[in-house]
Amino acid sequence: MSMTICSNTPGAYPEIGAYNEVDKQLESSGFSSDSSLILNKPEVRQYWSSVSSHISRSGDVFTNDKEKISSSIGEDAMDIDASPSLIEKYNSFPTRKILPEQDEFENDVEDDASSSLKEKSQGSCEIEIASEISSEILNGTSADGNSEFHDFAEPPPSQNESVALSFSQSNDLDFLNNPSGSGSSNDINRSTSSISLPRHVSLDFNVYNSLCLTNEVTASESHNVAKFHLGKENKKSLLPRWKTIEMYGEVVKKTQDIYSNFQYAQYILRVGLDTEKLHELVKELEDESNSFTVDSLKEYLVNDAKVILKKLSAVGYPDAQYLLGDAYSSGVFGKIKNRRAFLLFSAAAKRLHIESVYRTAICYECGLGVTRNAPKAVNFLTFAATKNHPAAMYKLGVYSYHGLMGLPDDILTKMDGYRWLRRATSMASSFVCGAPFELANIYMTGYKDLIISDPDYAMALYEKAAALGHTESARILEDARRSGGFVSRGHPPSAQKYHKTSHEAVAAKKLI
């Protein structure tokens, strides 16, 4: 094989050709006999002179084209750079605080810790295009009630965001470059615990989920397995479980790793809300002088988790903000505080925490901690739905198809709702089991000539919803079984549920 350069196209890419007679090609190609990839000096000068002349002619053509454009639009317009760099574009946005409403819940944090954290977070935070898009969610409603960020269906994640992570004096300012903000930038393979579903970083601990397992949870299971194999007589050779929790907490609190602190807070909150584990720990502490009762141990663990989550929330860690807001909204710390929960959800939503975006939409929809605002609720639901949040897709589909929450009752909106329900059905789970039911109701009756009625497919959707735990679908299947497989094709239950009288429609418009 030899490499030859076309003589008639100076400056072009080399041609590679395979020849059978290699010796003849070396003699006729003009290359030196030392190597087929080395040109002689005269050939080099001739080649590069032709290349330079070709480049100069191309530059003249570009200059002539530029003169023609400048003559048509003006010299001043040509001097302006039409495509500024991304850094200049990002820096042109007004600076916003990560947590503007943090005064509501930051007062309970220790003064020395919160002051140092504020200085670090304010000094190291850089505005991003993703945070600009998320801030448009809060103030993104036009005069006609429509969203102003429909073009931002897929916003880019943060790439250069840095936040002070430590609780004391530290030089560690690294932050994981993803919207949820879990872990550190030195470990890009560390998975985040915000997977846009309530059970992943929520207080619903009845459902087993491997994505929520921390190191301490794994150690607890290993401890139980060791006790089982050692037997009751030899189990005293193991370190008590409460002692390991205390040691783990002491080590974590001394570290500067924000992810480890969040894992520890999540674990002790899980233990504090699990009555069975609390009884096991109380039995281990019976022989000690400072033994706990079940209530006192629960209060101790929950308060310890609360302090850690507040510190993490003060530095803008979205997973901690969401978990703390979920605890406030569910009354884990005593009284339900919807206002604090809303502030935490909205703060995490500004950092593109998708589950927090959905919870903020629920707050605006139901008036939890904030005045009811249907357009803002629809805006938040739209943003969460575009990020594949199943519950947001389900709610947005229902509202769009039935013309609720101030959405127009026209054909285009109905078809948008139909498409959202189809996407939600493909991602249906035990938490979002209503999407197949609503889609089945649509296929039972159809819609004009756009959605053809298909009772067989509707029954399959009812079966899917019933298998996921939807009671109304199970009732419809039971009625069909009793009637010999016949299902009425009249108005489905959802159509009767969402049907509005004239007085209700007027009241809804006044509310919006």
UniProtKB/Swiss-Prot annotation:
It comes from the Eukaryota. Sel1-like repeats lie at residues 318-353, 354-389, 390-429, 433-470. Pfam families: Sel1. SMART domains: SEL1 (SM00671). It is a peripheral membrane protein. Induction: During sporulation and at high pH. GO terms for biological process: cell wall organization; sporulation resulting in formation of a cellular spore. Its main location: cytoplasm. Residues 101-122, 144-165 are annotated as: Disordered. The keyword Transcription does not apply. InterPro entries: Chitin_Synth_Reg, Sel1-like, TPR-like_helical_dom_sf. The keyword Ribonucleoprotein does not apply. Residues 101-113 have a biased composition (Acidic residues). It is found in: Cytoplasm; Cytoplasmic granule membrane. Keywords: Cell wall biogenesis/degradation, Cytoplasm, Membrane, Repeat, Sporulation. GO terms for cellular component: cytoplasm; membrane. Required for the activation of chitin synthase III (CHS3) activity during the sporulation process. Belongs to the SKT5 family. This is Protein SHC1. It comes from Saccharomyces cerevisiae (strain YJM789) (Baker's yeast).
